[in-house]
């Protein structure tokens, strides 16, 4: 009701008033869950927000109202009063006129994206440092080649784009490609984002998009999407789900992260659905429906063991320096919130499975006597790697959704 087109301000004005900390592009720290990795996405064109960590979402008035415990009407009044003070509003309007949003391309069909990405990856090398990284994770050279992991190019981007055009590839609508100020096609690779590319494949093995596994994580984020949203002729990658293994398998496993899921597949032989993050459960549903139409009869959730994270305050957590309690309580508020967010996301997946009449169980490992995570083996890929290396790893335990989490 209050987020319509008749407003003379937008969500970026609200963000300015709230003094949210910007990390990159339209990503900010979340004031609701205390995230400091820039997981709150602001969508200026639609005047909406969504946190990929705590899943809070809504319009610009809800963003302000929820933080100040106001009604939408009260929030609207306060925002208007604040913007009418000083010259901020006039300066912001002038800036918007001078910097019009670049025209974006419509997302290209899957077959177009697949061919362009495949040709691009064929032209790229895999640096020794990245090859060693992948081998240390438990992959073989044959598997690395099969998945087409390649290093991010740091120069020659115009020439690479031209080579793809000469091969008959389409670049318009393919995330990561855009036109520079002269109209030449190029690619959104930057030196600060060096790393290796992780193709994200559909059920049928087509490359939908690519992620970059960063050499140097930024704000504790290890992955970035190869995207050109906000650039002339560019487009967003979205957050597609990676699928690897037999698409006709009766039992399918769900985890977080395409690289993790691919490693787990190669180490176990199981079929994996790999969401980009635990809160990306909305993207998981259409994949589950597609696999149900084949032969899938059961889902096994294998998210990281953070879902059983101990919440004791041990004064050893990486958030301790930011905690106002300074270890003066029995439980760590940051651990409690992190565990709540992950378990809530798991619950969303279980809810989707109930709606689809799809049996689902949960897989856990490396637990202590209280059933909490023992802190040694975090991911499903780590678990299978430990098993293969004949290290001490407890047998997996699968529990029904109805059991205590």
PLM feature spans:
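N-terminal structured subdomain of primase-like DNA metabolism proteins
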Residues: 1-98, 155-156, 300, 327, ...
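TOPRIM fold recognition
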Residues: 1-7, 50-55, 249-252, 260-405
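Short, surface-exposed acidic
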Residues: 22-26, 70-79, 85-92, 138-149, ...
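Terminal peptide-recognition signature
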Residues: 30, 51, 64, 134, ...
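Residue-level preference for well-ordered alpha-helical positions
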Residues: 65, 80, 135-136, 144, ...
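Conserved active-site segments centered on acidic
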Residues: 73-133
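Tandem CBS (Cystathionine beta-synthase) repeat/Bateman regulatory domains
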Residues: 124-166
């Amino acid at each position: 009701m209050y987020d319509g087109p008749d407003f003379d301000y937008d969500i970026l004005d609200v963000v300015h008033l709230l003094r949210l900390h910007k990390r990159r592009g339209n990503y900010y720290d979340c004031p609701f869950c205390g995230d400091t990795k820039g997981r709150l996405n602001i969508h200026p064109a639609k005047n909406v927000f969504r946190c990929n960590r705590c899943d809070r979402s809504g319009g610009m008035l809800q963003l302000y109202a929820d933080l100040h415990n106001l009604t939408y009407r009260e929030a609207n009044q306060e925002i208007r009063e604040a913007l009418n003070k000083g010259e901020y509003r006039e300066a912001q309007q002038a800036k918007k006129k001078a910097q019009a949003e670049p025209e974006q391309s419509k997302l290209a069909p899957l077959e177009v994206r697949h061919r362009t990405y495949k040709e691009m990856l064929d032209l790229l090398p895999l640096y020794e440092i990245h090859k060693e990284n992948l081998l240390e994770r438990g992959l073989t050279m044959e598997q690395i080649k099969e998945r087409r992991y390649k290093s991010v190019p740091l120069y020659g981007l115009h020439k690479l784009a031209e080579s793809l055009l000469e091969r008959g590839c389409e670049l318009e609508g393919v995330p990561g490609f855009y036109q520079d100020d002269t109209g030449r096609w190029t690619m959104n690779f930057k030196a600060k984002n060096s790393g290796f590319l992780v193709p994200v494949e559909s059920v049928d093995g087509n490359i939908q998009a690519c992620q970059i596994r960063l050499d140097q994580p930024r704000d504790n984020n290890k992955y970035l999407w190869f995207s050109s949203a906000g650039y002339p002729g560019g487009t967003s990658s979205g957050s597609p789900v990676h699928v690897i293994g037999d698409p006709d398998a009766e039992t399918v496993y769900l985890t977080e992260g395409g690289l993790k899921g691919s490693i787990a597949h190669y180490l176990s032989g199981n079929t994996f659905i790999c969401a980009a993050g635990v809160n990306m459960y909305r993207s998981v549903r259409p994949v589950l429906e597609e696999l149900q139409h084949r032969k899938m009869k059961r889902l096994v959730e294998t998210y990281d063991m953070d879902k059983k994270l101990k919440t004791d305050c041990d004064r050893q957590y990486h958030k301790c320096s930011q905690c106002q309690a300074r270890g003066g309580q029995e439980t760590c508020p940051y651990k409690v919130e992190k565990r709540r967010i992950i378990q809530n996301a798991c619950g969303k997946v279980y809810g989707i499975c109930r709606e689809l009449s799809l049996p689902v169980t949960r897989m856990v490992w490396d637990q202590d006597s209280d059933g909490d995570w023992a802190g040694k083996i975090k991911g499903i890929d780590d678990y299978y790697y430990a098993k293969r290396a004949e290290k001490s790893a407890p047998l997996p335990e699968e529990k029904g959704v109805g059991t205590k989490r």
